[in-house]
Structure formats: C-alpha cells, structure tokens
Design a protein with these regions (language model features):
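Residues lining the SAM
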Residues: 77-80, 106
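Generic C-terminal helix-cap and adjacent flexible tail
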Residues: 215-216
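S-adenosyl-L-methionine-dependent methyltransferase catalytic module, highlighting the catalytic core
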Residues: 5, 84-92, 96, 102-212
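Conserved N-terminal segment of class I S-adenosyl-L-methionine
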Residues: 1-69, 73-77, 90, 126, ...
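Active-site micro-motifs of SAM-dependent methyltransferase domains
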Residues: 63, 81, 111
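A generic secondary-structure micro-motif detector
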Residues: 35-36, 79, 83, 121-122
Length: 216
C-alpha cells in the first residue's frame, strides 16, 4: 500500500531518492530499505534495525535532527497517535521534507473504537479525520490522498490479539509490545481479508486512515 501510494503521487521511484521511515519499529514499511533512514525513539528498535544492516538512528519526531528539506519522502505509519504533541511532529516532518516531496501518514481514527488495547499499546488518542486534515494543511502540506484503510474487522482482530497477549502477563508483554502485531505480517490469508474489508468500509466506519500530502 505504501509503495503504491508513493508511485501514485510521486516520481521518486524512477530516480535517485531517499526516504525517512519514522517509528517503524522492527517492521519497516519502506519500499526500499537501502535508501531509507529509520528514525526510532526506542533504543531497542534502533539496535535491532542496525543488526539487520539498516541505517537506523535514535530520534524524536517532534525534534528531528536533520536539516530542512532532507528527504524526498517520509513514512509515518501508526506513530502520531503515540505522540502527545503530534502537531509538532507534523510540522517537523514538513520541515525536513524536500519541495515536491511526499509524506504518508496512517493513524487510528474515531474515538468510538477506543478500547483498553489502545491504552495498553500507548495510544494518546484516536484521531478525528477532519481535525487531522486541518493540522496537516496548517503545516504547509497539501493533501493529495485521503483513504480509509481500516475496518470493524481490523479493529476486532487487533483488540482480541492484544487481549490474548495480555493474558501472558503484563511484564512479559510490556517488554515485547513490538511483537504483538507480527501475527498480521505472517498471516497472508488474514491480511487479504482485512484488505477486502477495508476496501468495502467507508471513512465513517473505518478504524484507520491514510493521508498522503505533498510539499509545494
């Protein structure tokens, strides 16, 4: 999905480019790891990525240690919901994004879907799509795509996966939260069902949304 969005709204795949993947944890979403800088807040994730031979740095999305207009594209998938001052995070991404660059953001949406698993994985909020759209525009970015990519099925599965995992003990799981969603990565069939459900779900009923925005 990230790859297709990049191809749809940017020509960077046809030329030399660099990407920042912010908060990827141990599951990068970039289409080309060799051209990507991975920016992670957690030292554990940085160490893991470096052991895989990847270019990973410790960093905070609200205080990025890069000069302005450093990246052709920025990926920020399931990150802003963890950030208290998320507006600063958006403005920092806009600052380090090159002119005509593309930022892709995905976040959980709609407070009606809030459950205890949101709190367990460190969510500060579930976003209102309209509010987030205004915040993205306020940073100087132009939204070129707005697409629901979640569903009630995704929400139900996520809640139950976390519920089952928590039964193993909070101490163990707090040290391995990053592994909770590996289930999705290895179960191709289930992923297909999730994608189909998302494609049939309206923004009003979606659990996750994708924004793609350009810097003009």
């Amino acid at each position: 999905m990230i790859h297709k969005t990049l191809e749809k709204h940017s020509d960077i795949m046809a030329r030399e480019y660099n990407i920042a993947d912010i908060g990827s944890g141990i599951s990068p979403v970039t289409p080309d790891i060799s051209k990507t800088v991975f920016i992670e807040l957690e030292k554990q994730a940085v160490d893991f990525l470096r052991k895989q031979g990847l270019n990973a740095v410790k960093g905070d999305i609200t205080h990025l240690s890069f000069q302005k207009e450093s990246f052709d594209a920025i990926l920020c998938s399931e990150v802003l919901e963890h950030v208290p001052n998320y507006k600063k995070g958006i403005s920092e991404m806009a600052r380090v994004l090159k002119k005509n660059g593309l930022v892709i953001i995905t976040v959980p949406i709609h407070q009606k879907y809030w459950k205890d698993d949101d709190e367990f994985v460190g969510h500060c909020r579930r976003f209102d799509p309209e509010t987030l759209a205004k915040d993205i525009k306020a940073s100087g970015l132009q939204i070129v795509e707005r697409k629901p990519i979640g569903s009630r099925l995704e929400r139900w599965l996520t809640w139950n996966i976390v519920k089952i995992a928590r039964r193993k003990g909070n101490k163990e799981m707090n040290a391995n939260k990053v592994k909770l969603f590996a289930f999705y990565a290895i179960n191709t069939l289930l992923l297909q069902f999730i994608k189909i459900a998302a494609a049939l779900t309206s923004e009003e009923n979606s659990s996750i949304i994708l924004f793609a925005a350009k810097k003009n």
